[in-house]
Structure formats: structure tokens, C-alpha cells
Design a protein with these regions (language model features):
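Alpha/beta-hydrolase active-site loop
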Residues: 90-112
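Conserved alpha/beta-hydrolase
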Residues: 65-85
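The serine-hydrolase catalytic nucleophile loop
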Residues: 54-67
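Glycine-rich nucleophile elbow surrounding the catalytic serine of serine-hydrolase chemistry
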Residues: 123-133
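Alpha/beta-hydrolase fold nucleophile elbow
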Residues: 112-125
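Short beta-strand element of the alpha/beta-hydrolase
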Residues: 45-54
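N-terminal cap/lid segment of alpha/beta-hydrolase-fold proteins
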Residues: 2-43
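The alpha/beta-hydrolase serine catalytic core
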Residues: 11-16, 23-25, 136, 141-178
Length: 178
């Protein structure tokens, strides 16, 4: 006996009221930062997490983004300049600037319902290091979570290739050790 599959459409509310995933291009100093925005269900503004991935990529962080979205947060994850299709050339020295650019996008955008008073940052590995720097310099970030942050300030290659960045990193590490 042949069974027939029945299909019925599910209609959701307006786009801001249902969970969704958006591709977002954020304009940075070296071109576009390719970004993914997870929006939570429900009307009104939502607390927002800026999710900073490590290098080489972010595929390990998407499960965290999904969980945060289910918990009612909007989550923005971007790719650093020169990585994973974002414009420009990659440099560790530009990571913090890219994170500031993404944060400025959250603070200035009016389309997606970001709660500007409830912005959090979460970073893993290199993203954890950048997250620490960002949260130390930007009071708009209420809380930060650093997941196994790397200590790139102690790497000799950074000292040689980007001495100004190395000095800034060492200052942050010394301050956080106090």
C-alpha cells in the first residue's frame, strides 16, 4: 500500500519575532567582514553576544551560538580581516580592530533589535585573547567569557613582526595578572 506524504506549511510571525540566521557584511577598514548573526525568537530587543572565534576558524563555535540563541540572545560572529572570505590581509595586529568594528556595528544597527545595554563578549582561543582586550577597553561590554584564551603576547614571532602590538599585549597581560 502506497502512503502519501502530507506537507503543511508552518507560518511564523514577522522575521524579528522568530529565530533566524542572517549573513551580514560589516564594513571595516580593510573591506567587508563576513559575519553570521543568529537572532533569537520574540519581539523587542534582545541581549547580544559578540562571539569571537579562534584561528583558523569558527565552525566549532556555531553550536555555542545556537545554544545562546535558544536562551534568548542574539549572537554575532564575524571572520577577521583576510580570513574565511573577509576582505583584506590577515594579521594578528588587526584582530582587535576588527572586533571593535563588529561591536560598533552592534551599537549602531537598528534593524536587528540589539539591546545596547546588554552586550556581552565570548571568545575562544585567539578569540578569547581578543575578547579580553576588547572587554578591557570597551565599557559597553557588560561581561566577557574567555574560553581557553591563548597567550599570544609571549610568542617570539609576535615580538619580531609586530613590536608595538607585542608591547600592548604585554601590558594587558601584566594588568590582568594583578
Amino acid at each position: 500500500m502506497k502512503q502519501e506524504f502530507q506537507y503543511s506549511e508552518t507560518h511564523y510571525g514577522a522575521a524579528p519575532c522568530r529565530p533566524d540566521v542572517h549573513g551580514v557584511l560589516i564594513k571595516g577598514k580593510r573591506g567587508r567582514l563576513l559575519s553570521v548573526l543568529y537572532t533569537a525568537a520574540g519581539e523587542g530587543t534582545h541581549p547580544t553576544v559578540l562571539l569571537l572565534h579562534g584561528i583558523p576558524g569558527c565552525e566549532k563555535n556555531y553550536d555555542l551560538a545556537q545554544d545562546l540563541r535558544r536562551a534568548g540572545f542574539h549572537v554575532l560572529s564575524f571572520h577577521y580581516s583576510g580570513s574565511w572570505g573577509s576582505d583584506g590581509d590577515y594579521s594578528l595586529a588587526h584582530d582587535l580592530e576588527d572586533a571593535n568594528t563588529a561591536l560598533n556595528f552592534i551599537l549602531s544597527d537598528e534593524r536587528f533589535g540589539f539591546d545596547k545595554d546588554r552586550i556581552y563578549a565570548v571568545g575562544h582561543s585567539l578569540g578569547g585573547f581578543v575578547c579580553g582586550q576588547l572587554s578591557a577597553s570597551r565599557p559597553e561590554i557588560r561581561k566577557a567569557v574567555l574560553i581557553t584564551p591563548c597567550d599570544i603576547g609571549r610568542l617570539p614571532v609576535i615580538r619580531e613582526q609586530a613590536p608595538d602590538y607585542y608591547r600592548a599585549v604585554c601590558e594587558v597581560l601584566e594588568e590582568s595578572a594583578d
